[in-house]
């Protein structure tokens, strides 16, 4: 099956101002995607791909309003025949309510809330206890809510509070290190070092592995464990070689590699320029991006034992680090310490592992190697 992931930003407007937002330097461009352009996007995605992952992103995508998503699903459903669609939305949660949740669940759509931890931990997103209470309320009513958080210097020593919250309310969680761009570009109050990151992982990892009630995805620990013990790269963007199977489309139809902060030299044209979205991968700027990424991957493959797991890392991180052709030091240092740490932990403590999510993952993907665990 031919697969593509599309991050669709129907608006870049936002109703809050997160202090470290990687879009802060774009000043939250005003404008909203028309339903006509949305239909054009869906048609041009459907031409060449039969396995489509579509994530509504932003800005804050729920600012588009309920009626937009009713029409959006009508359009998507017209193109679902003989194709596999995975649809989600990444929202700050302020406007998420039961009405939206019902619409999303009816259409097989998952919602993920940007959330940096309960109580005061989440004040970095300017949404305080309001969002914590909303998550608790929606989960109590049976709605599936995933969480996406950002690790900064302000919360890295308190990840256990975040972990316990997700366990208590049954939310899958992914934590990303803060991006060195936008509001956090030069702010040492937010940026963390790889040493900080590794120390936090090492502290929480044994607790997570031995927790028999932790039946939920908890990234980055889930992905690092998947890679270390199954010896394959994890199915998340920065480790799966996203070129050429990942695009971001803004509200005006502009196309970039992904929704992160990319300079104009990597602009890939406009959806209006193409009859088929796959043509964006023929753009000269994409060829330059691919050329630089190949140089980086060749370097990594020749010099690192972990290339098969990280695939040379994230293009955007290398660009922000100053050179697309070289790996970003943060993730490299993390990999070289965390992967052997997990392998050693398993060798010495596998009898203590009680985490049902981990045990099921190993049995499911371990080709029989872990069936007796």
What name fits each language-model region?
Residues 1-36:
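Canonical Radical SAM [4Fe-4S] cluster-binding loop centered on the CxxxCxxC motif
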Residues 10-17, 60, 243, 299-303, ...:
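Cysteine-centered iron-sulfur cluster-binding motifs in ferredoxin-type domains/subunits
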Residues 17, 21, 169, 240-243, ...:
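General secretory precursor processing signal
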Residues 39-55, 64-182, 187-192:
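Radical SAM/AdoMet-radical enzyme domain recognition
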Residues 123-243, 248-252, 260-270:
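Radical SAM enzyme [4Fe-4S]-AdoMet core and its adjacent flexible, acidic
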Residues 262-373:
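Flexible mid-to-C-terminal extensions adjoining Fe-S/redox cofactors in radical SAM and related proteins
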